[in-house]
Amino acid sequence: QPRLIEGLENVKDSFNSYPLDAVAQAVGSAALSDSAYYEETAKKITATRDKTIERLREMGFSVTDSKTNFIFAGKKGVDAADLKKFLEKNKIFVRHWDAPRISGYLRISVGTDEQMEILLSKIREYVSR
């Protein structure tokens, strides 16, 4: 049975790409039990997301409408995979997929206002070179 358990441990994340450990579950449960905190945090994230979307669109990016804590954005003439590498060199981490329909886009998680300003600044730097 130890080999079976080891095998299951090795593949578990391939079925659930966003696993939550017990600590994350406890923190999430506590956050949801404080509805005032939850509402305030949701408002901040929404405002930051919407402001970032607006700024990306001003730079010519196509951005899908979002009701989540992430932004899906791309720009014609900008190599999304190369932009991802540029951002990583600047310690900004986004996601990119090679699938043909979405290879020109990045998935950007919404951070704090300050983090998103840094992201926008680096994207502006990249597209203006």
Role assignments for model-derived ranges:
Residues 34, 80, 112-116:
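Alpha-helix N-cap/loop-to-helix initiation residues
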Residues 9, 13, 33, 76, ...:
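A generic structural signal for secondary-structure junctions
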Residues 45-46, 58-90, 106:
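Conserved PLP-binding catalytic core of the aspartate aminotransferase-like
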Residues 7, 27, 74, 82, ...:
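Phosphate- and divalent-cation-binding pockets in alpha/beta enzyme and binding domains
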Residues 47, 51, 82, 118-121:
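Alpha-helical scaffolding segments of alpha/beta enzyme cores, especially the outer helices
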Residues 85-90, 95, 99-129:
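PLP-dependent enzyme catalytic core of the Aspartate aminotransferase-like
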Residues 1-56, 62-64:
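PLP-dependent aminotransferase class I/II
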